[in-house]
């Protein structure tokens, strides 16, 4: 365990050194436009990624200010246009966090839309509210925001799943119904293991699971200041002080959907941690490794003698960790035995303490099911 702890310290040092260089290229001094300067009729542009890592722009027109319209205060009503918006059918899932500029000044992030519209109109979260996330060291209460009653809804954040099958994702959704997860099956891009610097308009992922299986949400970076970033413009899960893994993201394309268009992307290299998930967005830091729980899963099918071993890292969270770990195991079982139906399973697990001061906890059990041993 001492070797593991030394390796983790070494990894954090290397990661911080590497991304010190990346951040120096991505951070540029930007002037903010305060909300009291924003007037109806003003025009500007927004930035986002529609394919690959290339940042594109599209026009924005300010329609007004919605006082106390959002969970963190005022929101800015705007109309979006241009060839990109026409091509995508409006603001797509994954565009949340797209920075909006007027007269060269950063106004805020595209964050909310109206239900039952073509998504040409939406709300912008002011940048002043987003950068306050950097001053939240601990979990705190946030006033409730009833999106259902107002029909104003956060632009959905696509949940990209790589290495998981559809059955496992349906199982996950059933266990975490309150979050209304809508996972999208995806694959890896060719350069996913390469770290890229983030800038305003880049795609970014907040990941739960990393390794042989990956699961996380893709959105857009609003602002970068040295090693710190803010993104999304609205809460992801609203978990307050949290530790998600921060990753690069690659966008394959924007998929047009009758319900809502969405960015189809892959989760790339780990580049830092997301430590705030609150009303005005998410915030994180380059080069800082989020604590994670390493899990090794080995499954052997006695009928076919097929064996698979998967290794993942899962975020530390009292509510999410057990479900994410169980989903990862369930997925590995599904893919190894490659069938549904009855059977018998012998299950062994070993838990090791992080600091190595406690003895390993090992348990064995046997399960039988006539219907579906996978879910047992």
What are these regions, as identified by a protein language model?
Residues 14-24:
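Bacterial N-terminal signal peptides
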């Amino acid at each position: 365990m001492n070797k593991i702890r030394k390796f983790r310290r070494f990894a954090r040092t290397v990661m911080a050194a590497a991304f010190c260089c990346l951040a120096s290229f991505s951070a540029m001094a930007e002037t903010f436009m305060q909300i009291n300067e924003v007037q109806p009729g003003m025009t500007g542009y927004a930035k986002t990624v529609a394919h690959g890592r290339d940042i594109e722009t599209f026009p924005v027109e300010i329609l007004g200010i919605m006082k106390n319209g959002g969970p963190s205060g005022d929101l800015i009503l705007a109309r979006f246009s241009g060839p990109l918006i026409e091509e995508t059918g409006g603001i797509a899932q994954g565009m949340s966090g797209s920075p909006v500029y007027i007269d060269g000044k950063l106004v805020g992030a595209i964050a909310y839309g109206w239900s039952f519209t073509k998504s040409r109109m939406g709300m912008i979260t002011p940048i002043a509210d987003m950068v306050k996330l950097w001053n939240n060291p601990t979990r705190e209460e946030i006033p409730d925001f009833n999106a259902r009653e107002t029909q104003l809804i956060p632009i959905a954040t696509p949940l990209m799943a790589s290495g998981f099958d559809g059955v496992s994702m349906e199982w996950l959704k059933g266990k975490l119904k309150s979050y209304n997860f809508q996972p999208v099956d995806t694959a890896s891009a060719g350069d996913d293991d390469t770290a890229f610097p983030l800038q305003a308009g880049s795609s970014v992922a907040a990941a739960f699971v990393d390794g042989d299986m990956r699961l996380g949400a893709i959105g857009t970076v609003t602002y970068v200041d040295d090693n710190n970033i803010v993104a999304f413009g609205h809460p992801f899960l609203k978990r307050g002080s949290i530790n998600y893994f921060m990753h690069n993201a690659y966008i394959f394309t924007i998929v047009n959907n009758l319900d809502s268009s969405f960015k189809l992307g892959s989760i790339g290299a780990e580049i830092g941690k997301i430590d705030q998930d609150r009303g005005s967005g998410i915030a994180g830091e380059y080069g800082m490794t989020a604590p994670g729980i390493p899990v090794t899963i080995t499954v052997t099918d006695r009928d076919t003698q097929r064996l698979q071993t998967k290794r993942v890292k899962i975020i530390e969270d009292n509510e999410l960790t057990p479900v994410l770990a169980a989903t990862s195991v369930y997925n590995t079982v599904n893919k190894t035995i490659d069938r549904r139906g009855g059977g018998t399973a012998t299950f062994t697990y070993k838990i090791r303490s992080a600091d190595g001061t406690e003895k390993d906890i090992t348990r064995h059990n046997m399960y039988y099911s006539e219907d579906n041993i996978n879910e047992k």
